[in-house]
């Protein structure tokens, strides 16, 4: 397994799917969608901060860009796995595009004062910590993403999207509730992953001894 592939597996917690690279062209639809998602990030930020971040129409545009980027994340993975479009380039860039999109949205919302900084720091620290842990244990085998981790990713994206929209009143309260659920899932799945990693490492050491 190459270095870039190990990085992708560590970040995504998905096992390597078939023979990556070599046979698939870099300029395929899956990689184009991944690059498009990365290009969307600065465009999303421009819309988010337009008019000091308080222009309602621009915030709706920012939400549309964010939602589209999240959808492309779903489809590029399906194309890569099911249609022989997996490449080392895509395996390396895809998780970078994911983290860049989510990180930029969280930081942008906090800079505008729409989202408390502690929420952004908590979520990004969890993502960075779990990624580092995955990289540390990758040689011992991949710890697959749990259903909770997948649910966390979905709820997190929905919560961020709701905060991007110019909501008020009961709708804003609903956004806060969804974000609270995302925070709870972020903490629970982070603790669960650390526990599983330590348990697996402990089991390997006992077997070796």
UniProtKB/Swiss-Prot annotation:
Species assigned in the record: Mycobacterium tuberculosis (strain ATCC 25618 / H37Rv)
Keyword Transferase belongs to the record: yes
Cellular component terms (Gene Ontology): peptidoglycan-based cell wall; plasma membrane
Pathway linked to the protein: Lipid metabolism; phospholipid metabolism
Designated name of the protein: Probable phosphatidylglycerophosphate synthase
Keywords associated with the record: Cell membrane, Lipid biosynthesis, Lipid metabolism, Membrane, Phospholipid biosynthesis, Phospholipid metabolism, Transferase, Transmembrane, Transmembrane helix
Membrane topology per record: Multi-pass membrane protein
Segments passing through the bilayer: 32-52, 105-125, 147-167, 171-191
EC number from the UniProt entry: 2.7.8.5
InterPro entries, alphabetized: CDP-alcohol_PTase-I, CDP-OH_P_trans, CDP-OH_PTrfase_TM_dom, CDP_ALCOHOL_P_TRANSF_CS, Phosphatidylglycerol_P_synth
Pfam families the UniProt entry points to: CDP-OH_P_transf
Domain of life the protein comes from: Bacteria
NCBIfam families with a match to the protein in the record: pgsA
Catalytic activity: a CDP-1,2-diacyl-sn-glycerol + sn-glycerol 3-phosphate = a 1,2-diacyl-sn-glycero-3-phospho-(1'-sn-glycero-3'-phosphate) + CMP + H(+)
Function recorded in the entry: Probably catalyzes the synthesis of phosphatidylglycerophosphate by transferring a phosphatidyl group from CDP-diacylglycerol to glycerol 3-phosphate.
GO BP terms, alphabetized: glycerophospholipid biosynthetic process; phospholipid biosynthetic process
Family: Belongs to the CDP-alcohol phosphatidyltransferase class-I family.
GO molecular function terms noted in the UniProt entry: CDP-diacylglycerol-glycerol-3-phosphate 3-phosphatidyltransferase activity
Signal peptide: none
Main localization category: membrane
